[in-house]
UniProtKB/Swiss-Prot annotation:
Subunit structure: Heptamer of 7 subunits arranged in a ring. Interacts with the chaperonin GroEL.
HAMAP family per record: CH10 (MF_00580)
GO MF terms held by the record: ATP binding; metal ion binding; protein folding chaperone; protein-folding chaperone binding; unfolded protein binding
Source organism of the structure: Vibrio harveyi
Lineage: Bacteria, Pseudomonadati, Pseudomonadota, Gammaproteobacteria, Vibrionales
Name this protein carries in UniProt: Co-chaperonin GroES
SUPFAM superfamilies, sorted: GroES-like
Length: 102
């Protein structure tokens, strides 16, 4: 994928999670909520402050993140793959997969 977001923008590929009902039935389509987790594919150079200083982003390519769905998050199709374009401000957390396993 050849895309470079500007400033504090981040390109994220949504990571689908299997949703199950309380009874163990796998939910698909509209019955399952869209995941708010994804993998960062590309990041901009950083937020430009009023004094012209560039503040680097906290997220990096390969990070698994939890993001806010809705305003500010735009879905695009690039190279046949659906990705999300969002500001770093729309990312609420970086998931440390190693810590979850332990």
């Amino acid at each position: 994928m050849n895309i470079r977001p500007l400033h504090d923008r981040v390109i994220v590929e949504r990571k689908e999670v299997e949703s199950k009902s309380a009874g163990g039935i796998v939910l698909t389509g509209s019955a399952a909520e869209k995941s708010t987790r994804g993998v960062v594919l590309a990041v901009g150079k950083g937020r430009i402050l009023e004094n012209g200083t560039v503040l680097p982003l906290d997220v990096k390519v390969g990070d698994t993140v939890i993001f806010a769905e809705g305003y500010g998050t735009k879905t695009e199709k690039i190279d046949g793959k659906e990705v999300l374009v969002m500001s770093e401000n729309d990312i609420m957390a970086i998931v440390d997969l190693i810590a979850i396993v332990e």
